[in-house]
Amino acid sequence: MNATCRLIGPAIAAALVLLPSLASSQAAGAQRLAWLQGCWRIDAGSRIVEEQWSAPRGGTLLGSSRTVRDGKTVEHEFVILRETAEGRLAYEVSPSGRAPTVFTSISLDDAGVVFENLQHDFPQRVAYQRKGDDLLAWIEGPARNAPGQLRRIEYPYRKVACTGEP
């Protein structure tokens, strides 16, 4: 048996042992955000923001949101949050019919997740943080007209029943 054959056998055995654990750690990525599933809402006078997330399945969560002002939908988004081959999460968002933008997770724990895309103009970061029974989402990036400054917009959601009623 030559040296190459002696190395390939153990390498294949190691791969067979490690692949299931790699797959389960990736599955755990989407599963760690199971607390995000359900319906979330912000009431701010004549403006209502609603966001809804599916349960994590198949390495994905699906999300949608809309902003209604004075009884008219003025913004909407569709999101797929998916596990990547690199073991991270990708946040692919299509806002109000525009082309999708992908952000990649830079931080993930049981209390929240932060996604980043430094090539995007604004936002460059998108985050979801669990706050008890509430949810704080935020977006952040360079402030327009203020070089070197960050602009951050927060969305303090409260959990609501997914009844479909106003």
Label every model-predicted segment.
Residues 37, 42-119:
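Central antiparallel beta-sheet cores of small beta-barrel/beta-sandwich binding domains
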Residues 126-128:
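Exposed beta-sheet edge/beta-hairpin loop segments within beta-rich domains
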